[in-house]
Amino acid sequence: MAGATAATPMDIDAAAPPPGAAAKGKAPLSSTPGGRAAPWVEKYRPQSLGDVAAHRDIVDTIDRLTNENRLPHLLLYGPPGTGKTSTILAVARKLYGSQYGNMILELNASDERGIDVVRQQIQDFASARSLSFGAKQSVKMVLLDEADAMTKDAQFALRRVIEKHTRSTRFALICNHVNKIIPALQSRCTRFRFAPLDGTHVRERLKHIIQSEGLDVDDGGLTALVRLSNGDMRKALNILQSTHMASKQITEEAVYLCTGNPMPKDIEQIAYWLLNESFSTSFKCISDMKMRKGLALVDIIREVTMFVFKIQMPSDVRIKLINDLADIEYRLSFACNDKLQLGALISTFTGARTAMVAAAH
């Protein structure tokens, strides 16, 4: 965590409610759709700091700063689905209670990323005097989600706004890539990194939701959900809800069919072909499986790469193999021909097989 400007006690302002509380008619981040069809990512979003599934050290620190009336400007960064937005919204609910709507300005910087937003909406909101009506704190809050999508000019303009309105407003910036935030903004905020969630936390939260919804999920299905989420709670919930809509019983196979990812047994079969069969046989078999199961070559590459770590082979062969697989995945990201890259994949393993045979002798 990097240091911030000295956090001073929050000052109490008085006067009119802030303008621009809703951004151009957009629903705020915290609005939760009603009804049974509500996305589970919103239905089960933590409502208080105590409900946040992980990162207890960060949450406890922010909670303590809030209780001591010393909340600084915040910069929360890390991969998607790790609780950044939920944490800030929980802080805002704790601070403002029923006055939440009047005291916080929520903007998604990926949609509203220009300098005009800083000069108009944020400047107007921060400069307006607020009347707390008994809220615990009367300092206002500006929440900028996906702040790394803001233009550099907008970030420099925001720096000046933060300096000018520190006594009356706290700014909370949320982003995935902290290197896209200018140093001048970073130095004015206290930084917290939200790492991908541990599989244990994802599993426990999923168990709670499965029980609440009365779902039929076996152990294989739950393990598949945790594995495919890669520490992203939002992704895990979306996969769970999608699979539930497609299948009454949520099994490992149902989860993989819903997401289109290759199953572990498919990867084992593909690895067997790559390590044992001829070029033509491997090409035909993998192509047939891709067509039959609707698999994407890039997903196969990623899973095969992880499988390579489990195979016994000389270190130099493994290093070259992983490097070649990374090159193939890179080329696929530029929409290169799938058949050509499948051929490159098989050729890479053919070379690795030759190197392993030579090393054995």
UniProtKB/Swiss-Prot annotation:
Gene3D superfamilies in the record: 1.10.8.60, 1.20.272.10, P-loop containing nucleotide triphosphate hydrolases
Compositional bias of kind Low complexity: 1-28
Gene Ontology biological-process entries: DNA repair; DNA-templated DNA replication; negative regulation of defense response
Primary location recorded for the protein, binned into one broad class: nucleus
Key words of the record: ATP-binding, DNA replication, Nucleotide-binding, Nucleus
Localisation: Nucleus
Span list, region Disordered: 1-39
Tissue: Expressed in roots, leaves, shoot apical meristem (SAM), flag leaves and panicles.
Pfam families found in the cross-reference section: AAA (PF00004), RCF1-5-like_lid (PF21960), Rep_fac_C (PF08542)
Protein residues bound to ATP: Y77, G78, P79, P80, G81, T82, G83, K84
Alphabetized GO MF terms: ATP binding; ATP hydrolysis activity; DNA binding
Induction comment from the UniProt entry of this chain: Down-regulated by sucrose starvation.
GO CC annotation: DNA replication factor C complex; nucleus
Subunit structure: Heterotetramer of subunits RFC2, RFC3, RFC4 and RFC5 that can form a complex with RFC1.
Similarity remark: Belongs to the activator 1 small subunits family.
Record function comment: May be involved in DNA replication and thus regulate cell proliferation.
Protein name: Replication factor C subunit 3
Gene from which this protein is expressed: RFC3
